[in-house]
From Swiss-Prot:
GO terms for biological process: cytoplasmic translational termination. Responsible for the release of ribosomes from messenger RNA at the termination of protein biosynthesis. May increase the efficiency of translation by recycling ribosomes from one round of translation to another. The keyword Cytoplasm applies. Belongs to the RRF family. This is Ribosome-recycling factor. The lineage of its organism: Bacteria, Pseudomonadati, Pseudomonadota, Gammaproteobacteria, Chromatiales. It is found in: Cytoplasm. HAMAP family: RRF. One of its GO terms (cellular component) is cytosol.
Amino acid sequence: MTDSIKKDAKARMGKSIESLRNELAKIRTGRAHTSLLDHVMVEYYGSDVPISQVANVNVEDARTLTVTPWEKTMVSKVEKAIMTSDLGLNPSSMGTVIRVPMPALTEERRRDLVKVVRGEAENARVAIRNIRRDANNALKALVKGKEISEDDERRAQDEIQKLTDSHIEEVDKVLAEKEKELMEV
């Protein structure tokens, strides 16, 4: 009984951290990386699809991405999608290749991004704590239904607390990495 609750909590906490990593990958640092454009959607024959489904995205150098659409007709649509995304990038096309230079971040912009990153990390911590609460409530329901003893509940709660602590520690590590990456000049 308690094992399934713990497994569920662990899986959900892991998903929270994975979600945090995905959100942080979208936040632009001064360096170019292909996952930066992952969430950019391009209109392709009437439906919006991720850019990775209509073009190759490569890193040309530390500050430049190259996007090569598979169809020549898609060049302008891909360029427009990158321009209108919330990333603040200004692509330029050269024939069938779109170059996306990464502008250097100002100190002020870096600080703003750090605030955003900290907010995302806090959201992940809150999600993990909510998962802990759900697990503890499930344990209380089992005690109430006389399916487990109070001692078993206490042991399980302690284990869930350890899980919570380790996952929050992981969130802090991810946050520290991203902050360090953002503050690099």
